[in-house]
Amino acid sequence: MPILSKIWAAPAAGILRKTPRNAHQMRLISMTSSMKAKVFNSAEEAVKDIPDNAKLLVGGFGLCGIPENLIQAITKTGQKGLTCVSNNAGVDNWGLGLLLQTRQIKKMISSYVGENGEFARQYLSGELELEFTPQGTLAERIRAAGAGVPAFYTPTGYGTQIQEGGAPIKYSKTEKGKIEVASKAKETRQFNGINYVMEEAIWGDFALIKAWRADTLGNIQFRHAAGNFNNPMCKASKCTIVEVEEIVEPGVIAPNDVHIPSIYCHRLVLGKNYKKPIERPMFAHEGPIKPSTSAAGKSREIIAARAALEFTDGMYANLGIGIPTLAPNYIPNGFTVHLQSENGIIGVGPYPRKGTEDADLINAGKEPITLLKGASIVGSDESFAMIRGSHMDITVLGALQCSQFGDLANWMIPGKLVKGMGGAMDLVSAPGARVIVVMEHVSKNGEPKILEHCELPLTGKGVISRIITDMAVFDVDTKNGLTLIEVRKDLTVDDIKKLTACKFEISENLKPMGQAPLNQG
């Protein structure tokens, strides 16, 4: 009988008596006992010692993979003055939106405000501090902390307010639109002719994590896309609290199936009564896809049908939210495009049929999706590593404004519209990235969106490769400006000149604007 088995089978007095011979085994028993003590009886018990003014890393992407029970527990335990580091803050009445409603959050460090109206209201009215951080940079700052790296260089955000400073962190409560606290400029350095920004790691006092299941030692598994920011955040706090849907005995989760090893898990809670709402429910069309009948819808379809011609068989592409998500409707049968979603999915498939949706499987627009055969799923840090590392063949995204030299603005209208940059800054800043902007040629007010210089805060400087609108297609040279290469068949070059607020060259091979056919298969 092995020595450990004899000790475990011995009377209590024998277990407690430490001798030189059994000292090592006693340490193992002590460790095993303390590891099993990780399991807390309730979420409230697990979070009750979090102090006021703590910095919390809170996992999730939209409402996918958020620690529902732990967040609700904090609304009951009542901590104040919290700094929350999270990709976004859920919605008004769920996720971190609950802590915003109870005024328990003093500051957010996020990449995206999204559809949370209360988040935007508190920020614009000076009630809440907000440090905008590009999504990939946020993931890497967290990952770096867990890996013991104090700072790193990234191309993301160079030439924007994120690097140059001046982004509003806090507005005045008394003077509408007045910036009370602005971000500071960051150190830059050039490597191999490319400009980089230095970013510092983000440590948390506590991390609030949602996983699928764990064993009693704290080895954890995520399910589908619910790993997202939970993955790197597990490793970057002094105390990581994990809530799961199932707790099993050690050994049930095979070693190769462990996503986060027990060394990173300090407290474990069995979650209850999960709601798992889907932020933007979308479902597969029943029957043929019908063309839009509205003017706005027709414009979007024209843009998407042209954007689809940018795809080549076998390429890896990232599509932004909005118009870019329509482009796959025009990919022909037998044509493979590996769609990457910034929340960690490679191989995004179509919307699910109603009734088959899975809240743990969403895209960057927080819509339910399916997976194609051969798909894979990674954490947010790995997702942006492949973006920042220039592994994407193409990025297609929308814009508020573009300049003639390829500058892009699509994340903020100061004092008015607050969405955040999300992953856009990372996507357009990757060295050598091919960036296709898709947008209406003019705003709702009829004002040109292609300008000499962007008037809004930049998402990227000199980053656009091609602009596709509902009227024309331009190639972009970051030194020489725009060249008109295609015009919609019912328009003339003069029409384009009237609605474009900058000069442009006209290609010798100017042709009618291409349109991919709608795939009804």
Swiss-Prot record:
Keywords: Mitochondrion, Transferase, Transit peptide. Gene3D superfamilies: Glutaconate Coenzyme A-transferase. Pfam families: CoA_trans (PF01144). GO terms for biological process: ketone body catabolic process; ketone body metabolic process. Homodimer. The active site is at E342 (5-glutamyl coenzyme a thioester intermediate). PROSITE patterns: COA_TRANSF_1, COA_TRANSF_2. This is Probable succinyl-CoA:3-ketoacid coenzyme A transferase, mitochondrial. It is an enzyme of class 2 (transferase). It comes from Caenorhabditis elegans. Key enzyme for ketone body catabolism. Transfers the CoA moiety from succinate to acetoacetate. Formation of the enzyme-CoA intermediate proceeds via an unstable anhydride species formed between the carboxylate groups of the enzyme and substrate. It comes from the Eukaryota.
